[in-house]
């Protein structure tokens, strides 16, 4: 009897950044479909814009990162990326990374930072999924498709919005709750909007090479 094809491990992820242009990543978090968690804060080594602090509660003071008045352990960006890579590789199986608004924001930024710091993206990460256009397609009846709105629609509690770990956990719970109401499984839903990692690495490499001084 032929062995069943191994399904990829689904990992829901999110990042927090300093601005909408995302000059610095401040937090990388992820949760697997089985509940394994990754969470790290990154030291920006510079003051953060006021609107960033207003949204995330994060601010930089005297060399340290704080959130809502409390010191947050943080590490340099390069170390954080390497730890994320090691965590992804530790599962020793194909991975699909899932983001909300990933094609326009999270996936582009995380891939760009890997390339910028000369760190090879984990080879076991095959595809990146974006749930934002998927929910727009499947839930046309709601007013918007922000994570908080989707959480409310699916009766999921989101108590710490704009924290990458809380948002990753919420995204996982939202997707799992949603597919229970539809005649499709989680893979069918996620595959509505999926791109291979190569799509992002090639695009970002082209940008980096174009912007390098001659």
Label every model-predicted segment:
Residues 13, 129, 166:
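Active-site flanking residues adjacent to catalytic metal/cofactor-binding acidic residues
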Residues 112-124:
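A short alpha->loop->secondary-structure connector
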Residues 163-176:
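Acidic, divalent-metal-coordinating active-site segment for phosphoryl/phosphodiester hydrolysis
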Residues 113-116, 137, 153, 174-181:
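Active-site catalytic microenvironments for nucleophilic, acid-base chemistry
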Residues 2-111, 115, 140, 145, ...:
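Conserved non-catalytic scaffold segment of RNase H-like nuclease domains
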């Amino acid at each position: 009897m032929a062995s069943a094809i191994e399904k990829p491990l689904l990992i829901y992820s999110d990042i927090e950044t300093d601005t909408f242009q995302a000059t610095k990543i401040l937090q990388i978090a992820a949760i697997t479909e089985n509940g394994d968690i990754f969470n790290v804060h990154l030291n920006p080594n510079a003051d953060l814009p006021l609107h960033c602090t207003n949204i995330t509660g994060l601010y930089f003071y005297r060399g340290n990162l704080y959130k809502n008045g409390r010191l947050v352990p943080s590490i340099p960006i390069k170390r954080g990326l390497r730890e994320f890579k090691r965590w992804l590789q530790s599962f020793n199986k194909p991975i699909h990374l899932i983001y909300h608004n990933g094609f326009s924001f999270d996936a582009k930024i995380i891939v760009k930072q890997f390339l910028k710091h000369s760190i090879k993206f984990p080879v076991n990460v095959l595809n990146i999924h974006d749930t934002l256009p998927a929910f727009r397609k499947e839930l046309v009846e709601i007013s918007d498709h922000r994570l908080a709105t989707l959480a409310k629609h699916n009766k999921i509690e989101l108590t710490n919005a704009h924290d990458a770990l809380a948002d990753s956990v919420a995204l996982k719970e939202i997707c799992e709750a949603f597919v229970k109401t539809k005649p499709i499984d989680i893979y069918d839903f996620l595959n509505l909007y999926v791109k291979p990692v190569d799509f992002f690495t090639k695009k970002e490499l082209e940008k980096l090479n174009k912007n390098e001084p001659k």
